[in-house]
């Protein structure tokens, strides 16, 4: 009986030892970019125009975060292009897209600009129509950019189109009239 108790005690100590986190082990910091890169749009594509533009905004915010590294920028660029309409993707190679993006990010970082927050049109403000180009939606994204202590708002108007799988894809965007 005493031998059984001893064996159980040794087993409990062993289990506790292997399940105790190592205080010296490297910890992985979960950044916004890391979280964004774990998303799988093939399995869980955003369902509405607003959700697609929200994903675009989240990725954009990650691009300009100083903690986002070069490999993450490439991965985020891949993700962003999954939100784009085929015609938009066809207008620029991936390499050109990433080169242009990195150049813009470098300018933002050198000027210490940061996207602090954003807002997307409410669902009731999304305009939808069907015409010879397909089913389209128009909505707005406002990026709040912190620049030298001030917050500057950049308002963009987005055009999205449903593809053959009924996924909303970004056809393009332009700077909107600033109010």
Which ranges hold each PLM region?
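A mature extracytoplasmic/lumenal domain signature
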Residues: 95, 124, 141-145, 156-158, ...
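Short low-complexity stretches enriched in small and charged residues
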Residues: 10-15, 36, 73-74, 90-97, ...
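Hydrophobic core residues within well-ordered beta-strands of beta-rich domains
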Residues: 52, 137, 154-156
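Surface-exposed, charged secondary-structure patches
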Residues: 101-146
């Amino acid at each position: 009986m005493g031998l059984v108790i001893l064996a159980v005690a040794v087993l409990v100590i062993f289990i506790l030892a292997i399940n105790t986190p190592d205080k010296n082990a490297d910890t992985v910091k979960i950044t916004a970019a890391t979280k964004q890169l774990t998303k799988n749009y093939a399995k869980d594509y955003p369902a509405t125009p607003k959700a697609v533009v929200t994903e675009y905004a989240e990725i954009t915010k990650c691009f300009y975060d100083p903690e986002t590294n070069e490999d993450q920028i490439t991965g985020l660029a891949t993700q962003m292009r999954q939100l784009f309409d085929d015609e938009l993707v066809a207008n620029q190679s991936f390499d050109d897209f990433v080169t242009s993006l990195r150049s813009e990010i470098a300018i933002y970082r050198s000027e210490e600009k940061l996207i602090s927050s954003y807002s997307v049109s409410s669902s009731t403000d999304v305009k939808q129509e069907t015409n010879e180009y397909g089913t389209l939606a128009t909505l707005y994204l406002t990026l709040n950019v912190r620049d030298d202590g001030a917050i500057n708002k950049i308002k963009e108007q987005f055009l999205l189109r449903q593809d053959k799988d009924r996924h909303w894809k970004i056809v393009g965007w332009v700077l909107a009239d600033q109010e």
